A protein has these predicted regions:
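Phosphate-end processing signature that detects enzymes handling 5′-triphosphorylated RNA
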Residues: 1-183
Length: 183
C-alpha cells in the first residue's frame, strides 16, 4: 500500500537537527494518508525518549485535513484529542510543512513478540505543495528500500534470522531526515 506523509518542522529545522545530532529526547509531527487519494488523514506525533520510541495519533476527516493544508487550523482547538491542541499551539509558534515523503509499504506481522516488519520501497520526496499530488515527487535514496523491525517485549529468533540480509546497513533511520536532503 502507498503511504504519503507531510512532515512539519520549525523555522530552525529543530526536528531534523535533533535527529541528525542523535538527541535523546525529540519529537516530530506529520500529516499522513494511505492510498492514492485521502479518505481521511492521520495527524501523528512521533517521539523518542531514552531510546524508546512512541507515537500519538489523531484522526482528521478529509475536510479537516484539507482545512489544515489551507492554513486553517482553528478547528483543532475543538477536537477532544490533546494531540490536536498541542499541534495547534506548535503551529502558532512556527511549526510549518517542510517536505513530503511517499513510499510503497509491504507489512508482515508475527504474533509472538507482536512483531511488525515493514519494507518501504519506491521512496520519493518533494515540496509540501505536492502532498495531494504525490505522483510528481522525485525518487530518493537511489532505489534503496528501508526495512523496519518493530516489536514489543522481545524479538523472536526466527525473525532475527529472517531479517539478516547481506549488504544491508543496520541503523536508526528517518525517512524524513533522508528525504530532506532533496529539498
Amino acid at each position: 500500500y502507498q503511504v504519503v506523509s507531510l512532515y512539519y518542522d520549525d523555522p530552525y529545522d529543530t526536528a531534523l537537527r535533533q535527529k541528525l545530532d542523535g538527541v535523546d529526547r525529540r519529537e516530530k509531527f506529520r500529516l499522513r494518508y494511505y492510498g492514492e487519494k485521502p479518505a481521511f488523514f492521520k495527524l501523528e506525533k512521533k517521539y523518542k525518549v531514552k531510546g524508546l520510541c512512541g507515537k500519538g495519533a489523531c484522526r482528521l476527516s478529509r475536510e479537516e485535513g484539507e482545512r489544515l493544508l489551507r492554513g486553517d487550523s482553528a478547528f483543532l482547538l475543538e477536537k477532544e484529542e490533546p494531540l490536536a491542541r498541542e499541534f495547534y499551539a506548535k503551529l502558532r509558534r512556527g511549526l510549518a510543512p517542510k517536505t513530503v515523503v511517499r513510499y510503497t509499504r509491504e507489512a508482515f506481522l508475527y504474533a509472538p513478540g507482536n512483531v511488525r516488519v515493514t519494507l518501504d520501497g519506491d521512496i520519493r520526496a518533494g515540496a509540501p505543495e505536492r502532498f495531494l499530488i504525490p505522483q510528481k515527487l522525485l525518487p530518493a535514496l537511489g532505489g534503496l528500500a528501508v526495512v523496519e523491525v518493530k516489536y514489543d517485549a522481545f524479538l523472536p529468533e526466527i525473525v532475527k534470522l529472517a531479517v539478516q540480509v547481506p549488504n544491508r546497513q543496520g541503523t536508526a533511520c528517518s525517512k524524513y531526515a533522508l528525504c530532506r536532503r532533496y529539498d
